[in-house]
């Protein structure tokens, strides 16, 4: 980087470190002059874990370790990154977006980028796989859009995540149990069968009538 900005960067990192809580040394979601640091949240911690790599890899790694330990979760067969610490709860807002099972969409997408730059390839693939499943991607004229293209900033973030450089692979401890995806697929199959039953697709008599003229 440009050496002219090194004193500025070093000063910012030092000031940020001074404001970390001793009991949970993660960067807070908000910081206002003269006030105590705000709550730590998954979306902002994921972003800091990704962006700090550009200025201080050691600090970035410490933040990513906290993200991985306290915010990556597995609920009802669905992996993701919680917006709030596992022992707390809160609602969604403009930063986190709507929460699903406590997960924040931005936290999951940006968390995948953080996982990539820290060499946590398996977790990055799992989180990106979740975006493929939930985002319902559609390809049209050589372009891929998620959620029907209704949230273009989401498309941009996913593209940014996929283009984040993969760090040197490390033997990260697995966070999810073996066969972690089985409950989700079973649940999806039950929902699909229920919808098929409600729609009459499982009734051979009703299916045969659909093909007959009135």
Predicted features by range, described:
Residues 1-106:
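Extended ligand-binding clefts on enzyme/binding-domain cores
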Residues 60-211:
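CBM-like carbohydrate-recognition segments
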């Amino acid at each position: 980087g440009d050496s002219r900005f090194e004193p500025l960067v070093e000063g910012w990192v030092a000031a940020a470190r001074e404001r970390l809580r001793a009991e949970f040394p993660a960067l807070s979601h908000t910081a206002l002059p003269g006030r105590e640091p705000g709550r730590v949240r998954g979306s902002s911690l994921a972003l800091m874990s990704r962006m700090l790599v550009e200025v201080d890899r050691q600090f970035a790694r410490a933040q990513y370790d906290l993200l991985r330990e306290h915010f990556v979760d597995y609920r009802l067969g669905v992996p993701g990154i919680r917006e709030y610490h596992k022992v707390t709860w809160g609602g969604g807002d403009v930063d986190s977006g709507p929460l699903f099972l406590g997960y924040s969409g931005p936290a999951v997408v940006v968390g995948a980028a953080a996982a990539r730059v820290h060499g946590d390839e398996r977790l990055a693939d799992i989180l990106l796989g979740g975006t493929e499943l939930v985002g319902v991607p559609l390809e049209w004229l050589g372009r891929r859009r998620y959620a029907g293209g209704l949230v273009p900033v989401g498309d941009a973030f996913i593209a940014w995540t996929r283009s984040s450089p993969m760090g040197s692979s490390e033997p990260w401890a697995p966070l999810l149990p073996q066969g972690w995806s089985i409950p989700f697929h079973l649940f999806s199959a039950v929902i699909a069968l229920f919808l098929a039953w409600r729609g009459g697709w499982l009734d051979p008599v009703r299916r045969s009538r659909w093909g007959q003229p009135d």
